[in-house]
Amino acid sequence: MAPPNGTTNGETEVATQGSYTAVSTGRKTTMHRLIEEHGSVLMPGVQDALSAAVVEKTGFHAAFVSGYSVSAAMLGLPDFGLLTTTEVVEATRRITAAAPNLCVVVDGDTGGGGPLNVQRFIRELISAGAKGVFLEDQVWPKKCGHMRGKAVVPAEEHALKIAAAREAIGDSDFFLVARTDARAPHGLEEGIRRANLYKEAGADATFVEAPANVDELKEVSAKTKGLRIANMIEGGKTPLHTPEEFKEMGFHLIAHSLTAVYATARALVNIMKILKEKGTTRDDLDQMATFSEFNELISLESWYEMESKFKNFTPKAT
């Protein structure tokens, strides 16, 4: 039976109820292999090295370096186009070092400029240990995909960026996601048209941001080619679904972009209120990690073991 969404350059796709099998003629990335193995991949967002370590130790296979979350954690600022590509690369390098077994995919916003800027950015992300990137078609300065006031560049302009990114990636183990924010300003059909154009330009997967309901999600799945991404934001425009539900709808990668930063913010606000009101936390220790739990999280004992190797130096006898 012919695949419902056709074939792509370099691979044959077979899609049934969200499953995906790629027969590669050259490149197959870590993310491709995860999707083949699991059908759909749940990818929590991370904002820093600590959150990445938590995600890895919890047993996830992939993580998403969320620009929204990094902007908040690093700068204390909203996702309003204020984060630079240099800061994104810096955050990514720390995250991949803290969680070396995760397949780390990065929110690349608009790529830092034109096609040549995109190519430099891609090479720096690869050097920083990333395994993939999202590149979106918003006008710069961009905004969070679930905020008001978004605008998009001409589709052909973003397609050139995707083509440039594909060239920069070459044979690297790096997964390219083309994101479109056209749903809000121009409607779902335009978002779908752009997604397919960007797939043709060289994207491994496409991401139509902020479908408003299940019917729109199903329409995206039915009308877009190749691998598809869904983004779950608590309180956002798209209703929350499980990976199994998304697999049935025909989505392959599910990002929970802001779960970690929202949970961190709530916990921090709550404990700071207690400390301000009571002047102590002695009756509320259950709201925090213990000293030993936290030390285990950051692998303290492994550092003691490494330290012990270098306590004494004995020169060779001559």
Swiss-Prot record:
Obligatory cofactor(s): Mg(2+); Mn(2+); Fe(2+); Co(2+)
Induction: By ethylene.
Region span, Disordered: 1-24
Tissue: Accumulates in senescing flower petals.
Cofactor stoichiometry and binding remark: Binds 1 Mg(2+) ion per subunit. Can bind other divalent cations such as Mn(2+), Fe(2+) and Co(2+).
EC number: 3.7.1.1, 4.1.3.-
Subunit record text: Homodimer and homotetramer formed by a dimer of homodimer.
Name listed for the protein in its UniProt record: Petal death protein
Species assigned in the record: Dianthus caryophyllus
Gene that produces this protein: PDP
